[in-house]
Amino acid sequence: MNSPNPSPIGPRRRQAPANRLGRARFTLIRSGLMLGILSWTMPICTAGAQEKAIVPTEVIALFNGRDLSPFVVWLPATGGHADPDRVFSVVDNIDGAPAIRSSGQHFGGLISRQSFRDYRLVVEYRWGLITWKPRMDRARDNGILLHCQGEPGNAGRKFDSPWMRSVEFQIIEGGTGDIILVGGFERATGDLIPAVLTLMVQPGQKYWDPTGVPTKFTKGRINWQYRDPAWTDTLGVRGPRDVEKPTGEWNRIEAVCKGGDVTYFVNGTKVIEGTNGSLKEGRILLQSEGAEIFLRRVELQPLN
């Protein structure tokens, strides 16, 4: 998440080595299409009410392999709960299996209809080839917002932001595994409610360091442990200690959420940890943020 409220206007396709991307044939699923459109464009409650969160006792598949019915779309650029440009769709064959496609054309997300707490989120993703203005030549960017609370769009005072109050699992070339704390406004009072989290960092630094000093953060990005200090916001950027796989390969990320604590893993490597968070439950938002991405597994596992 780098740009607050963009106006993407056009795509660019890039080729990648065949040994990385392979044959990515995919077609849109048509069975049950009207049911899918009706179910995932209907708005969730916008009064800011938070229903009782579900604690998984068995695996909950947020992507069922067929449609997007567990989610509601949020795209401020196209009116909120409408998706005329099919930013989000299901493809039935990407590397041999169905997946969610997030085109990246407009900033926004798929918001889960239900709230959750105390879980292990497991997601498998890979980047596509398409990038969009204003991030056409910048690092491929995406993310997953955890513990989303309040109204969609409440990260902006006018409730027209792509994002909402949450703790983000950042997915970006060179920075996958960062934590971003996103505050959100309350409509009734106009107050900005921050997302608060304590992380171990060295004094004056914003890189997670398990040997550091506990520091309370209320906004912004805290970098994963080995993010390259020389990182630049350029397409295809990679750091010498990145654990995200090269573009076109599948990655597995995990977010372990217990109470106000969060721990992130990228391809089996622990990259960051936060404790004593003010957000302990909420919806889950899958972002669209200027770069095509595919998600073939999105599931919540019980902690025990």
What are these regions (language model features)?
Residues 13, 23, 27-30, 56, ...:
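Hydrophobic alpha-helical context, especially transmembrane and signal-peptide helices
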Residues 29-43:
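Bacterial N-terminal signal peptides
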Residues 47-304:
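Carbohydrate-interacting regions of secretory-pathway proteins
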